[in-house]
Design a protein with these regions (language model features):
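Thiol/disulfide oxidoreductase modules built on the thioredoxin-like
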Residues: 160-167, 171-224
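N-terminal targeting signals for export/organelle localization
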Residues: 1-67
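A short beta-strand-turn-helix
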Residues: 55-88, 112
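Extracellular/periplasmic catalytic domains that process cell-envelope and extracellular macromolecules
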Residues: 49, 81-84, 114-115, 162-164, ...
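The canonical Cys-X-X-Cys-His
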Residues: 97-101, 190
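Short pre-active-site segment immediately N-terminal to redox-active cysteine/selenocysteine motifs
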Residues: 85-88, 93-96, 127, 186
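Structural microenvironment flanking redox-active thiols in thiol-disulfide oxidoreductases
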Residues: 86, 101-161, 174-181
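PAS/PAS-like sensory domain loop/N-cap motif
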Residues: 72-74, 97, 197
């Protein structure tokens, strides 16, 4: 018996079929990507305002050696919103971060204005990127503005940091454990806490996408007032 030949598609029909198939595949892939974006977790930007700040214990440098520091030991747990207890300004930095280098001057200015009403605490992390290889000697020099070459991505002597020496605790977070517990992945970051440790202001919530643009000086004025 003679073998039947498959009927050939008219010229151009096979190209049309391939085009339709490619378009269908592209449409399915686009739909998958869109669903993935919708279902993907929202990037972490730090603790939500109104929640208790994540506590931590680490070594702190205050100008005279390193000693244990627990954030919650400094809270006023009886704060009722009307007492004169101090608020907290929590700053995360990396001594090799160029933005943190520049922010040193603003922090000096803010501390001179608010230091009697706000406890400043700087947490020195070490980001896992090139030329970010800090150590305690560098952290001390960054805080005190003393000579140590290696700050600002190994480009500058720490004595040249903008601003004045910082007269408040610097916390060692070389392992980034505190940074991660706060839901952060980069620096600089700042937050204002109420005297009982409740997060009152989160920089990323206000200055990130969809935020109202309120900056740190404005937030201090609104929340703490009196200046």
């Amino acid at each position: 018996m003679a073998r039947r030949r498959a009927k050939a598609l008219p010229k151009g029909k096979d190209e049309d079929v391939r085009t339709v198939a490619m378009l269908a595949t592209a449409g399915i892939m686009s739909l998958v990507v869109a669903i993935s974006v919708i279902l993907a977790p929202i990037p972490q930007v730090g603790p939500d305002e109104g929640n208790q700040a994540p506590d931590f214990v680490s070594e702190a440098y205050s100008g005279f050696g390193w000693s244990e520091y627990r954030l919650s030991d400094n809270y006023d747990w009886d704060w009722n919103g009307s007492s004169d207890s101090n608020w907290f300004l929590i700053q995360f930095i990396d001594t090799d971060c160029p933005y943190c280098w520049i922010e040193g001057e603003e922090m000096s200015q803010l501390h001179s204005q608010w230091g009697d009403k706000v406890n400043f605490v700087t947490i020195a992390a070490q980001l896992n990127i090139p030329n970010h290889d800090s150590n305690r000697d560098e952290v001390e020099a960054f805080r005190d503005k003393t000579s140590y070459f290696g700050c600002n991505s190994d480009r500058d002597d720490c004595i040249d940091r903008p601003g004045t020496p910082h007269d408040w605790p610097y916390i060692d977070d070389g392992t980034n454990s505190i940074l991660e517990s706060w839901g952060l992945s980069g620096t600089p970051f700042t937050a204002i806490l109420e005297p009982d440790g409740t997060v009152a202001w989160n920089k990323n919530k206000h200055q990130g996408e969809g935020g109202d643009g309120e900056d740190l000086p404005e937030a201090l004025q609104r929340l703490v007032g009196g200046q």
